Regions:
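Alpha/beta-hydrolase active-site loop
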Residues: 71-90
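Short beta-strand/loop motif that positions the catalytic acidic residue
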Residues: 138-139, 144-146
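Short alpha-helix in the alpha/beta-hydrolase fold that links the catalytic acid
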Residues: 153-163
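Catalytic histidine neighborhood in serine/cysteine hydrolases
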Residues: 164-181
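Primarily recognizes the serine-hydrolase "nucleophile elbow" in alpha/beta-hydrolase
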Residues: 86-138
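Conserved alpha/beta-hydrolase
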Residues: 50-69
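N-terminal cap/lid segment of alpha/beta-hydrolase-fold proteins
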Residues: 1-23
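The serine-hydrolase catalytic nucleophile loop
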Residues: 36-47, 156
Length: 229
């Protein structure tokens, strides 16, 4: 039976609502965020592919884009994302985060308290050509992808990759395509993303589920568990 997405909303700062679609599977949550001036459709079929592979995909519009509230503002991407990750994490546990372009580069500087368990940057594009300050988040596993046929974009992606902590993996393919188009042109990369999520996100999600279940059991009184005849 195919999985169909449903509309979803996440409230961030000052009651502002980010809207998009969610694939309601029982798997680990993965948040997708498009780049500036794009929309939900920019991901092509990545959201559906990940959902088919068992992940609860949450594909959201940025502030001021598409269905979301507010005015588009590049300066709020970091704070909005920190707020939405906090909301999602409180409900669904450890999170995977996937972005591309300028947004992917910006999100490498998320506050450690709101950091995802897995972060995937597809062709991240920082606004500078200078080395970036290091991002030390030992609890986050990073996957950075780039098409090496575009030398400039590959160098930019490398700047981001080099700024990250030790738990990271670089994946590249000989292609001029970048961002979601890179995945569309080389679909085996979606398989690589899936394997990375299964390796680093799924175990954390299962541990979270077990802890939550153990807590429910410990809080259940004998009277709660008594079966009435």
């Amino acid at each position: 039976m195919s999985i169909e997405p449903v509309s979803t909303e996440v409230i961030v700062g000052d009651g502002l609502i980010l809207r998009g679609y969610e694939w309601p599977t029982r798997g680990a949550p993965v948040v997708l965020l498009h780049d500036h001036d794009d929309d939900l459709d920019a991901w092509h079929d990545l959201d559906g592919e990940l959902a088919t592979n068992g992940f609860r995909v949450i594909n959201l519009e940025l502030r001021g884009h598409g269905l979301s509230d507010g005015e588009a503002d590049r300066n709020t991407v970091l704070s909005d994302t920190e707020a939405l990750l906090k909301e999602v994490k409180n409900v669904w546990g450890p999170i995977g985060l996937c972005a591309y372009g300028d947004v992917a580069a910006t999100l490498c500087f998320l506050d450690s308290l709101c950091a995802p368990t897995v972060q995937i940057g597809i062709s991240p594009q920082p606004s500078t050509d200078k080395p970036l300050d290091g991002t030390q988040r030992p609890d986050t596993a990073y996957l950075v992808m780039s098409g090496t046929g575009d030398k400039k974009r590959t160098e930019q992606a490398r700047l981001v990759f080099d700024s990250l902590g030790r738990n990271k993996l670089w994946a590249s393919v000989a292609s001029k395509q970048q961002g979601p188009e890179l995945l569309q042109k080389h679909p085996h990369l979606i398989g690589d993303i899936t394997l990375f999520l299964q390796r680093y996100l799924v175990p954390a999600h299962l541990d979270w589920q077990k802890t939550a279940l153990d807590q429910v059991i410990s809080e259940t009184t004998p009277q709660d568990s008594k079966i009435k005849k």
